[in-house]
Amino acid sequence: MGLETEKADVQLFMDDDAYSRHSGVDYADLDKFADSGSDRDPHRLNSHLKVGFEDVIAEPVTTHSFDKVWICSHALFEISKYVIYKFLTFFLAIPMAFAAGILFAILSCLHIWIIMPFVKTCLMVLPSVQTIWKTITDVVIAPLCTSVGRSFSSISLQLSHD
């Protein structure tokens, strides 16, 4: 139990024969991990999802748990986050990708074959509608507004103090 002044790196060490090297993550050396494969998020769509232990669990300076408890909870957090993510992606990634593919195919089809032809048709018809609307405005609405304006402009009020 003590005051920590530096951010500690977490590493999980296991024997090579008991654990596969390709399924473990070395959190202390992120540069090696990032360069090991192709970038799966080149446009940084999920850069806000990088949640660390310190972002979730934080102890104020005045109250600290035992160092061993802090280290074990940190390791358990990282391992559970890693294992649960792998488990969920194993069962959900393919069905979700399939559903997203179907959804985007439907949206693309609707956009290409229904929405854009409708928009183009409206844009072709709009000049005719604009001409008709201008005629209705000039024939009906403009004289009506002019008459009402002249009627109200002839009204005068005089106030007297009695």
From Swiss-Prot:
Keywords: Cell membrane, Cytoplasm, Golgi apparatus, Membrane, Nucleus, Phosphoprotein. Pfam families: Caveolin. GO terms for cellular component: acrosomal membrane; caveola; caveolar macromolecular signaling complex; focal adhesion; Golgi membrane; nucleus; perinuclear region of cytoplasm; plasma membrane raft. GO terms for molecular function: D1 dopamine receptor binding; protein heterodimerization activity; protein homodimerization activity; protein kinase binding; protein-macromolecule adaptor activity; scaffold protein binding. It comes from the Eukaryota. Residues 1-86, 108-162 are cytoplasmic. Phosphorylated on serine and tyrosine residues. CAV1 promotes phosphorylation on Ser-23 which then targets the complex to the plasma membrane, lipid rafts and caveolae. Phosphorylation on Ser-36 appears to modulate mitosis in endothelial cells. Phosphorylation on both Tyr-19 and Tyr-27 is required for insulin-induced 'Ser-727' phosphorylation of STAT3 and its activation. Phosphorylation on Tyr-19 is required for insulin-induced phosphorylation of MAPK1 and DNA binding of STAT3. Tyrosine phosphorylation is induced by both EGF and insulin (By. similarity). GO terms for biological process: basement membrane organization; caveola assembly; endoplasmic reticulum organization; endothelial cell proliferation; insulin receptor signaling pathway; mitochondrion organization; negative regulation of endothelial cell proliferation; negative regulation of skeletal muscle cell proliferation. Residues 87-107 dip into the membrane without crossing it. Signal peptide: none annotated. Belongs to the caveolin family. Monomer or homodimer. Interacts with CAV1; the interaction forms a stable heterooligomeric complex that is required for targeting to lipid rafts and for caveolae formation. Tyrosine phosphorylated forms do not form heterooligomers with the Tyr-19-phosphorylated form existing as a monomer or dimer, and the Tyr-27-form as a monomer only. Interacts (tyrosine phosphorylated form) with the SH2 domain-containing proteins, RASA1, NCK1 and SRC. Interacts (tyrosine phosphorylated form) with INSR, the interaction (Tyr-27-phosphorylated form) is increased on insulin stimulation. PANTHER family: CAVEOLIN (PTHR10844), CAVEOLIN-2 (PTHR10844:SF3). This is Caveolin-2. The gene is CAV2.
